[in-house]
């Protein structure tokens, strides 16, 4: 089980260094922050490319700590109050 990633959570990009998740669901928040999903953007311009295969929001897989971006980066933060496989 992995913590769900929210807007403002950290990521690490091998091309651009550390940054944060910038976009998420416009319709679904958790603990006051939009939930990040596959296709959402991080601060270096990369897109999230992996997420939970078991939970979708707006037809998109929910991103979790450890999921990846299209720059080869990794989401390094998640909210431990919501865990997904």
Regions found by a protein language model. Give the residues of each.
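Intrinsically disordered, low-complexity proline/glycine-rich segments
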Residues: 2-85
